[in-house]
Amino acid sequence: MHRLTAVAVAAVLTACGSGSDVTALKVAGDSLADAGTFGFKFTVQGATLAQTRIWVDHVADAVDVSPLCPRYTATGPNAVAANPAAAHCTSHAVGGARINVAGTAGDSTPLSIQQQLRDLGATAYGDRDVLLVVGGGNDAADLIGAYLGASADGGAAYVALLGELLSPAQVAQAAAGGNAGLAQAGGLYMAALADQLADTLQAQALAKGAKRVVVLNAPDVTRTPRFLALLAAVAQSSGGGATGAAMAEQIATTARAWVSAYNSRLAQRFATESRVAVVDFFGALNQWLASPATYGLTNTTSPACPATGTDARGLPTYSIQTCTEASLTAAAPAGAGAGWWNSYVFSDNFHGTPRTNALMGNLVNDTLRARGWM
């Protein structure tokens, strides 16, 4: 009797300790979630691709599924296609992907997050599959870049981008409103972008059987080193001093409002949808930046990786694929200890370090636990 009881208890404990009931982890998104489409991940590179870990890898560990691998492969510097040898791979995220790819050429390629979701939706979802989705950051960067370029092209690129998601009447009304109207239209564009993603998730995931969907909202891109450098350049070109600082702050406030418009609309679309959890990445990143020591961080503004050049505006550029743990160890700042880069928030000027990715993984895993999805 005691023997049988012990065996039964052991069986129960084993079942409880096995962790998750998740059957598959599927991913769509941009560089933040890319499992290695281009042969590297968008963070500090480990000794191997498998040892280079981003947040989706931490989620895969937590839900006890096989390591993620990229479904697509690079066929050129800016071209991606399905990899016939990777039909079993479930990570469809691609570095550089957008929800709305400017123009039409990329709309049916994996550089479109909507196309990634269509590709994933070609196979029905199981009841215990988890879908992770992240996007909007590159779209926000495109919108900000076009807006800032208005002084050079008279606003042509910005108006053209607005016209991809807004009606001709909305664009005309924005143009008639001058600078204020055009700035306000950016928020309408980002809200429409959220609708694009929500509609595609509805049609290609929820309608295909997905019951556990986690969507990260967009981070405040103005807090990244890329945009801090851009805003500093704006301040300088606007005369510097208080005048330049005020202009830079005005642009940052406008851009932040655009991202918030996207996030608010995304939250609204899924507020009553029990199958979708929207994770507040925007709020979490700002919390990490506001209280870095709480999260084991010290540097919130500078990239850990060295700049490798400059762009046409004279701003620093980075080569994330050559930024390795070995190279950073060899070029450690004075007094820095082993793995010093993990006290930084950013690896290059737009992407997180392994430590930041671990925090992102924790954020998502907490959401999965709260929903009872793991």
Language model features with spans:
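Acidic, Ser/Thr- and Pro-rich low-complexity intrinsically disordered regions characteristic
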Residues: 8-9
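C-terminal motif of bacterial Sec signal peptides marking the signal peptidase cleavage site
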Residues: 12-15
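Conserved active-site regions of diverse hydrolases
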Residues: 17-374
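Bacterial N-terminal signal peptides that target proteins for export
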Residues: 1-5
